Amino acid sequence: MKNYSEHKDATVKKSKTVDSQSIDWFRNSTRYINSHRGCTFVIVIEGETFDSPYFTELISDLALLKSIGVRLVLVHGARPQISKAYNRCDTEIIYNESMTVTKKEEIDAISGIVGTLSSKIDAMFLSGRAAKLDQNNGIQLIRGNFLVAKPLGIKNGIDFQQTGKVRHIQVDLLRKQLDNDCLLLQSNIGYSVTGEVFNLCEIEIATEIAIALKAEKMIVMTDCDGVTDSQGALVDYLGPDESSLHASRMKSSEKGKEHLFGKQIEYSARAVQCGVNRTHIINYCSDGTLIRELFTSEGCGTLISKDDSKKLRKGRISDASEILNLIRPLEEKGLLISRSKEFLESEIDHFRVIDLEGEIVACAALHLETDTLAEISCIATSDKHQNKGLGKRLLNSLESQAKNAGITEIFVLTTEAAHWFIENNFKETSLESLPKNRQLLYDTIRKSKIFIKKV
């Protein structure tokens, strides 16, 4: 009986913990629900997404967005399905810069493939979990042709025939249907003013629709976690100019998949440059990524925006308590020296922080030792924002600040982050290379390694 009681108590405690986490998440998500309500989101669904094991869950999550008042436009492609059809017919696929040449005799078959995928999306919103979100009225999905297409023409000497591009968006029709509380679905098939049928690129269509509607968000569902840096780490925030650099790097690849992803980044940046508030690049290969990106502060993909949601700014007196909470776990592990709140308040002018919607998620400090030498210290990032490039961003900012102040060299002391500093072009040096007054402050018990870098 005793064992049963202990097991029961443990189960109750575990249940309470899970319930508490769910309640906390829901409470924290309320501000996002309120901010998203009434906004227009354009969602890009690659053809590959249809084969994801989480496609049903994605449709349910889109229905959830619709149920809280988000105005949704879905744009889907059909690249892999079309490729499979070519392979079955033993037909050669001609590519140029990741674009497919669509022959006149093939466009009817392609239209049929695309129509089947559109019907699949339509059916999924009428069944399963998606349908249960609004049992009274259901989700009214409108499959339409909300654009006028034109031929892509001849590029690099290649006639793309029935491969097209957007001529203009029928924005009034889109707005009318959105005002009628409809969920809109646009495929990658478009028609010209003369009635010709064209095969278009879904990311181009989505971008032009998002710009025309002045959408709050464009969300690109793709098969990777987002944009990565040269070391392969996820970059969770980019401005449009930085995005364009990443796009150029990816598009220079001879691999078709990387070139295509570069194109997605390029269009995502264009959307922001032309008035869309934010674009998100997230992975459809994991469950719940859309919800995590839109309803949590840490997100899970790459956000492209002119308005930096993770603001890098000078430290303020009011930040001292949050900085203390941020660095305390590192102090307890012996990775940072102990600092009091009073000390942080007195040194706050030396700090730079990354402020994510009112929460300090990373910090670092710069101290000038001489006219030409400065120390960077107290680099810390919260656990849930690790591996997102925040430390590198702070380091770059402090390096620029030091350079502007006439500093020619910066140094750091570290017990465990030696490799990270080496990756960022620091070189190990001796204690004797530091000024005498700084040598006297060296902790002989911690025995930190010293690294230096020219700026």
Describe each region flagged by the PLM.
Residues H385, G389-S397:
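Conserved acetyl-CoA pyrophosphate-binding loop and the N-cap/start of the following alpha-helix
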